Every structure is written in structure tokens, then in C-alpha cells.
Amino acid sequence: MFLQVTGTATPAMPAVVFLNSWRRPLSIPLRSVKTFKPLAFFDLKGGKGMSEFHEVELKVRDYELDQFGVVNNAVYANYCQHGRHEFLESIGINCDEVARSGEALAISELTMKFLSPLRSGDKFVVKARISGTSAARIYFDHFIFKLPNQEPILEAKGIAVWLDNKYRPVRIPSSIRSKFVHFLRQDDAV
């Protein structure tokens, strides 16, 4: 039932034992992975739809750089998260309050396309918007542009899933859904 242990065990460092059933994850070819198509969960006729971006201006800090003097790729996920949270807060959804209630809005997928690097002191804008929804998911688009010339830096797509207190996907609560509908139906003149 157990594999042979490699190395020797010491009192300070016990040997690690793997079950025979442990297997390396299989690689799935990209062509076999299903792509998602967001469902039209909200009736958005007559509103500005999902074209409105929320913008947040930021500045690169020295500790966000890698050994090559550019922003580390992992930091861009933080920038996108900040943009999403600011966007949600602007329409009346506070992520901290959601967490305190025992529920969560968690990113299940985030795909990023890096177009150009940012360096220390660069000013940039993160643009976030809702691109679609389903019963339990919210689809986001994110863009990062360097200021002042609006040079494209990053394009990202994310899927956020509404989770209950056991971290299982559930329908987006009607109180939250109504905030999305209110925002998305606002007239362009407002």
C-alpha cells in the first residue's frame, strides 16, 4: 500500500510516506477544455449595459519589482483585485462585509495577458468592469494602462464565484444582484 521512503528519517525530520494512489495530475490539452460563455442573468435592456469601466489610479512601489527592475507578474493579480474591489465598493458591495457575513466572493479563474512592463514610480490606471453574469458567477474584464500616455500594459479576464460559509458555490443573493442591476441600468446621462 505504501511506496518506499527515500532518505532517512531523523527525530527532527520524520520520513515522508506517499500512498500508492498518489498520482501526478494529468495534463489536459487546451483544445479539450471547455470555454465559458457568460449567461445573461440580468435583464439589461435600456441601460448602459456592461460597457462602463471603473478606474483606479495607482503608482508602482519599489517592493513590487522583481530582480529585473520591472513589476513582478504576480503583482498584476493584486492590481486587478484592487480594481475589482474598488469597483464593487463603488456600487455598494463591500467585500469585507461579505466576508464577515460568512460568505465569500472568490476568484476561480484569472487569465492575464502581459503587453508591456511597469517600472518603479510608473503611474497607471486599472480599469475594471462586469462583462457578464450567471446565477453564481460574475465575469470581469480588467485593463491596465500606463499614464499619462495610456500605453496598454495588461489585459485580464476573471471569474468570481459567490460562495456560502462552507465555500460551496451558491446563487448571488438578491440584495447583491439588485445592486448590479441598478448600476447597469443607469442612464448614460447620469
UniProtKB/Swiss-Prot annotation:
GO terms for biological process: lipid metabolic process. Coiled coil: none annotated. CDD domains: 4HBT. Signal peptide: none annotated. InterPro entries: 4-hydroxybenzoyl-CoA_TE, HotDog_dom_sf. Pfam families: 4HBT_2. One of its GO terms (molecular function) is fatty acyl-[ACP] hydrolase activity. Its main location: plastid. The active site is at residue 66. Its EC number is 3.1.2.-. It is found in: Plastid, Chloroplast. This is Acyl-acyl carrier protein thioesterase ATL3, chloroplastic. The lineage of its organism: Eukaryota, Viridiplantae, Streptophyta, Embryophyta, Tracheophyta. Keywords: Chloroplast, Hydrolase, Lipid metabolism, Plastid, Transit peptide. The gene is ALT3. Highly expressed in stems and flowers and at lower levels in rosette leaves, cauline leaves and siliques. Acyl-ACP thioesterase involved in the production of fatty acids and beta-keto fatty acids. Can produce fatty acids of long chain (14:1 and 16:1) and beta-keto fatty acids of medium to long chain (8:0, 10:0, 12:0, 12:1, 14:0 and 16:0) when expressed in a heterologous organism (E.coli). Possesses thioesterase activity for lauroyl-ACP (12:0-ACP) in vitro. May play a role in the generation of long fatty acids in the chloroplast. It comes from Arabidopsis thaliana (Mouse-ear cress). GO terms for cellular component: chloroplast; mitochondrion.
